[in-house]
A protein has these predicted regions:
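Amphipathic alpha-helical segments
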Residues: 596-616
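Betabetaalpha-Me/HNH-type nuclease active-site subdomain
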Residues: 43-72, 390-534
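Glycine- and hydrophobic-rich flexible loops that cap the catalytic core of alpha/beta enzyme folds
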Residues: 2-276, 509, 516-572
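Well-ordered alpha/beta subsegment
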Residues: 668-704
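A short, surface-exposed helix-loop junction/capping segment
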Residues: 16-20, 580-595
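A cross-family structural signal marking well-folded subdomains
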Residues: 218-221, 226-437, 525, 534, ...
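Short, conserved beta-strand/beta-arch hydrophobic-aromatic motifs that form part
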Residues: 620-676
Length: 704
């Protein structure tokens, strides 16, 4: 490897050609990065005290260790973003010089020299004519700019937009052309030439990913897969799989969602959820473990699952029935279910499920998630529930085993029953519910063949929100009208949809229902509404009784829409785990708690406070310690003669312990689970120690 400081323009002039390998990410600099480069150039070109401005490194591979004086094409390993952006700026400047017939500036800036020195190789033809050849997605767009020809049908919007931005900036600063040219002439890079036979481009590439626009996890994965392959295989895999995958996503969606897809893919394949910042590291381990000898099979598998993801997550599904179910699920924003859906969709595509069965599965997930949201069950556990869900299913009876698996989930993972769901949906604040539009849309469109676009309507409170209700409203609601309004205002029974919210305002109920008219005298009251939500409203008054009656009717409908599956106890027992026949323990198996009254009292107080954290916390007495679990163990208590020894299941570096009571037991032999130990022997420290335990509980509940 050889690294040299170089003037950018001189570097471009003496270089024959740069090629962006197919494994590199697409051009991705935005207006923000382009504006920053422009500002740096203008500042540098204006200030005579600034002799150079460093813009980063250009790392390339050549066949032998030499300078760029050789005429071979150079593969760019790092620096394509700044190299491409500078090329766009120079192209825009050359075009302006040519159109406005600008004479040569600073003895080296003219339309001809800008083209022949920095953009093209005048004596070459075909692609060799151009200094910079981008990867497949961007290549034709840049070449169209350099050749001044129309853009292809599928062009790179990022390249075109940034080129137009530079055109605009040059136009706005045409009285400062010398400063622009002088600033360009002061740009400096570090050119890093790698020897293909001695240097590892992948390791160097990873180590240098610290400047410019940060590479995504997906960019790193693509480079990892393709960079080390022979050129022919590299081109084949890119052409047959990766390029098709990019096109399947679309340019913007690929940039926005491919990282998420890879995380869901790894979760589906391994059952473990990678930290969002560790997807690349986890992928390398996965690839080495499962596809170490067959990179083509790996890329083909990613491509296959990417097709599944695009179908349900990016609205690419072609089957009408499935498309509708996926649309509803996306509106719920339950990305955590995607690893499970990847598995289900794979089974579907392998003809292990019919379309109807696949729809049932999606509707079941939708009901499970929505019922939990209505019942305000914490969502912390959903990602782990769906990460491992498919592994527990009988693939020969997928739907029924999924129904059973969801029905037997305990406690905070539970599928809310009809009783719980019906109670909560009637009394909860539905107006300030994040999924209120989804709720009303589904209720309105149940049974409709021609769906209503509820986005054309606004939410109407039948009983108004105004705390200063009119005499008519007070009479309808009765002597406790304030309590009735406070209790039922935002509940489902009092909410509907209308296009005439301003016309209804706070007017009396009978007026809202029957008397309001538009400018042409047409009735536009609730009784004239075409919406199902506005049918069967009472004629004379609106009060607590009527709100409850409507809430009851709508809640029964909701239970049909978001239904819970039914299995006989016999079928359910078939899927329930076998009861543990191992030895069980209880408090009597811990003599230090039974024989020492002080330790017994301290332990009982401590356990009660731990169990009060959340209903999801469970307690298990083991032979040597007592475990407290949420997602996993978060604290284990080891009773001793004079103290309780607590092991917290979190990293020692993450614990906040200003009093310094904790001890680092990482890599030490121990009972319990975790790297943090704290000892408790008196009630004075109980509150402080509970704060430490709470940290471990929160850590288990929120960690990815």
């Amino acid at each position: 490897m050889r690294a040299l400081e170089a003037n950018l323009l001189k570097f471009l002039k003496k270089s024959s050609q740069f090629i962006i390998p197919i494994y590199q990410r697409n051009y991705s600099w935005t207006d923000k990065q382009c504006t920053q480069l422009w500002d740096d150039i203008m500042r540098t070109g204006t200030d005579g005290r600034i002799h150079a401005h460093f813009i980063g490194s250009i790392v390339y591979v050549e066949r032998a260790l030499s300078t760029v004086s050789s005429q071979e094409s150079l593969l760019v390993i790092d620096g394509q973003q700044r190299l491409t952006t500078c090329t766009l700026l120079i192209a825009a400047l050359a075009e302006f010089f040519e159109q406005h017939k600008i004479p040569e500036l600073l003895n080296s800036f003219s339309a001809k020299k800008l083209h022949n020195y920095y953009l093209t190789n005048p004596e070459e033809e075909g692609e060799r004519h151009f200094k910079l050849i981008l990867s497949e997605t961007d290549k034709d767009t840049l070449l169209a700019i350099l050749k001044n020809t129309p853009q292809p049908e599928r062009f790179s919007s990022r390249i075109q937009e940034n080129y137009e931005q530079f055109q605009k900036l040059i136009q706005e600063n045409q009285d400062k052309l010398e400063q622009i040219c002088r600033g360009l002439d002061k740009l400096v890079i570090v050119e890093v030439a790698l020897d293909r036979t001695q240097d590892n481009p992948q390791l160097i590439f990873e180590s240098m990913n610290s400047t410019g626009l940060e590479l995504s996890q997906a960019d790193l994965i693509r480079n990892y897969i393709l960079m080390g392959l022979e050129p022919d295989l590299q081109a084949e895999l890119y052409r047959d799989y990766w390029r098709k995958m990019e096109q399947l996503f679309g340019q913007e969606a690929y940039s926005q969602y491919f990282d998420d897809f890879m995380r869901h893919y790894l979760t589906a394949k391994t059952g473990n959820i990678p930290n969002i910042r560790q997807v690349y590291s986890e992928f390398k381990l996965f690839a080495h473990t499962h596809f170490s000898n067959n990179v083509k099979e790996l890329v083909a598998d990613i491509y296959t699952y990417a097709g599944y993801y695009c179908a349900f997550a990016l609205n690419k599904e072609t089957n009408p029935a499935l498309k509708e179910t996926f649309t509803d699920l996306r509106e719920l924003k339950v990305d955590v279910a995607y690893p499970f859906l990847l598995d289900a969709y794979h089974t579907y595509k392998q003809e292990g499920l019919s379309t109807d069965e696949m729809c049932q599965i999606v509707r079941l997930v939708e009901s499970y998630v929505f019922r939990r949201a209505v019942c305000n069950i914490p969502t912390n556990s959903l990602n782990k529930t769906f990460a491992s869900l498919a592994r527990n299913l009988d693939k020969t009876n997928y739907v029924e085993s999924l129904q059973a698996e969801l029905l037997i989930l305990p406690s905070y993972r539970r599928f809310p029953s009809d009783e719980e769901f019906l109670c909560e949906i009637k009394i909860r604040d539905s107006y300030n519910f994040a999924r209120r539009i989804y709720l009303l849309r589904k209720l309105e469109n149940y049974g409709r063949k021609e769906k209503v676009n509820v986005n054309e309507y606004t939410i109407e409170h039948i009983m108004p929100q105004n705390p200063n209700l009119s005499d008519e409203w007070q009479a309808d609601l009765g002597s406790d009208w304030q309590k009735v309004q406070q209790t039922y205002l935002h509940t489902l029974g009092n909410l509907t949809l209308t296009a005439y919210n301003s016309e209804y305002s706070d007017r009396p109920y009978v007026y809202k229902r029957d008397q309001v008219k538009d400018g042409d005298g047409n009735a536009i009251g609730l009784s004239s509404s075409p919406l199902n939500l506005n049918k069967n409203l009472p004629k004379e008054y609106w009060n607590e009784e009527q709100i409850n009656l409507r809430a009851e009717r709508l809640s029964v409908l909701a239970a049909k829409i978001w239904s819970i599956p039914y299995l006989t106890q016999e079928r359910l027992s078939h899927y329930q785990p076998q009861k543990n026949t191992e030895t069980t323990y209880n408090i009597t198996d811990h003599p230090h708690l039974m024989l020492n009254a002080a330790m017994h009292t301290l332990f009982q107080t401590l356990r009660q406070q731990i169990l009060a954290f959340d209903e999801c916390v469970s307690e298990e007495f083991l032979k040597l310690y007592v475990a407290y679990k949420a997602e996993t163990n978060f604290v284990d208590i080891i009773p001793q003669a004079k103290r309780l020894r607590l092991v917290l299941n979190m990293r020692f570096a993450d614990i906040q312990d200003p009093r310094g009571l904790c001890r680092d037991i990482t890599n030490l032999g121990k009972w319990g689970n975790g790297d943090v130990e704290v000892r408790l022997d008196n009630f004075d420290d109980l509150t402080y120690v509970m704060g430490l335990i709470r940290q471990s509980f929160d850590y288990q509940m929120i960690k990815d």
